[in-house]
């Protein structure tokens, strides 16, 4: 059984913990309690292949931003979360993606851009088109989710497993360390 390390990144209050807890336990956290760092494990079967996800739910506050390099270094897949009802959280996600690329020294890191809180459609500040365009620019999948309603939560974690499986394939895009030798 494959084991993968998934890191969930985003600003404070975007729903990183709510998404993770909804996926792992099937329950929604109503009260906002800022996270420093939480670690979860869950077995998941994607495309008939069992895997174990080690999910690191990170702090969204700048006070703990210095710890991000270590999270990124150890992570294999990244879920970048912003809140659909907070334009600033959408802007804040861009330097986080840049940090992943800087630490990994590779542009094709398995990641998914996620607009959370789709249940608050009437308060939306970030359009679907804006999220989709940014994901296309980054060449990564894009999803809108709701931890509260469990909308696309399981699909999100299944998709990051697919991204990591693809990256791990010998004929997949292996990045900086792949080489072709002709003798």
Swiss-Prot record:
EC number: 3.6.5.2
Lipidation positions, renumbered (S-palmitoyl cysteine): 176-177
Propeptide: 181-183
Protein activity control: Activated by the guanine nucleotide-exchange factors RAPGEF3 and RAPGEF4 in a cAMP-dependent manner. Nucleotide exchange is also specifically stimulated by RAPGEF5, RASGEF1A and RASGEF1B.
Keywords (A to Z) from UniProt: Cell membrane, Cell projection, Endosome, Golgi apparatus, GTP-binding, Hydrolase, Lipoprotein, Lysosome, Membrane, Methylation, Nucleotide-binding, Palmitate, Prenylation, Ubl conjugation
GO cellular component, one term: cell-cell contact zone
In-chain residues carrying the UniProt-annotated modification Cysteine methyl ester: 180
Domain of life from the UniProt record: Eukaryota
Pfam families according to UniProt: Ras
InterPro entries documented for this protein: P-loop_NTPase, Rap2, Small_GTP-bd, Small_GTPase, Small_GTPase_Ras-type
Residues binding GTP, per UniProt: 10-17, 57-61, 116-119
Residue span of motif Effector region: 32-40
Topology term for the membrane: Lipid-anchor
GO biological process, one term: actin cytoskeleton organization
Lipidation (S-farnesyl cysteine): 180
GO MF terms held by the record: G protein activity; GDP binding; GTP binding; GTPase activity; protein domain specific binding
Reactions the enzyme catalyzes: GTP + H2O = GDP + phosphate + H(+)
Location within or outside the cell: Midbody; Cell projection, Lamellipodium membrane; Golgi apparatus; Recycling endosome membrane
Reported modifications of this chain: Ubiquitinated; undergoes 'Lys-63' monoubiquitination and diubiquitination by NEDD4. Multiple lysine residues are probably modified. Ubiquitination requires TNIK, prevents interaction with effectors and inactivates RAP2A. Ubiquitination by the ECS(RAB40B) complex leads to RAP2A localization to lamellipodia plasma membrane, activation, and regulation of sorting at early endosomes for recycling to the lamellipodia plasma membrane.
Family statement: Belongs to the small GTPase superfamily. Ras family.
Function noted in UniProt: Small GTP-binding protein which cycles between a GDP-bound inactive and a GTP-bound active form. In its active form interacts with and regulates several effectors including MAP4K4, MINK1 and TNIK. Part of a signaling complex composed of NEDD4, RAP2A and TNIK which regulates neuronal dendrite extension and arborization during development. More generally, it is part of several signaling cascades and may regulate cytoskeletal rearrangements, cell migration, cell adhesion and cell spreading.
Domain notes: The effector domain mediates the interaction with RUNDC3A.
Self-association state and partner proteins as the record states: Interacts (GTP-bound form) with RUNDC3A. Interacts with PLCE1. Interacts with ARHGAP29, SGSM1, SGSM2 and SGSM3. Interacts (GTP-bound form preferentially) with TNIK (via the CNH domain); the interaction is direct and recruits RAP2A to the E3 ubiquitin ligase NEDD4. Interacts with MINK1. Interacts (GTP-bound form preferentially) with MAP4K4. Interacts with cytoskeletal actin. Interacts with RGS14; the interaction is GTP-dependent.
Record-given protein name: Ras-related protein Rap-2a
Species per Swiss-Prot/TrEMBL record: Sus scrofa
């Amino acid at each position: 059984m494959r084991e993968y390390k998934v890191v969930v990144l985003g600003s404070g209050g975007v729903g990183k913990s709510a998404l993770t807890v909804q996926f792992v336990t099937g329950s929604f956290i109503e009260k906002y309690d800022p996270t420093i760092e939480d670690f979860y494990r869950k077995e998941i079967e994607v495309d008939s292949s069992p895997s174990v996800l080690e999910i690191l739910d990170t702090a969204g506050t700048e006070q703990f931003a210095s710890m991000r390099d270590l999270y990124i270094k150890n992570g294999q897949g990244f879920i970048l979360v912003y809140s659909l009802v907070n334009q600033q959280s959408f802007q804040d996600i861009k330097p986080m993606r840049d940090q992943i690329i800087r630490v990994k020294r590779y542009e094709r890191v398995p990641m998914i851009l996620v607009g959370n809180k789709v249940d608050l459609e009437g308060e939306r500040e970030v359009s679907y088109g804006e999220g989709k365009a940014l994901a296309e620019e980054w060449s990564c999948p894009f999803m809108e989710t709701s931890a509260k309603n469990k909308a696309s939560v399981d699909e999100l974690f299944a998709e990051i497993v697919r991204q990591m499986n693809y990256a791990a394939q010998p004929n997949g895009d292996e990045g900086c360390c792949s080489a072709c030798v002709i003798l």
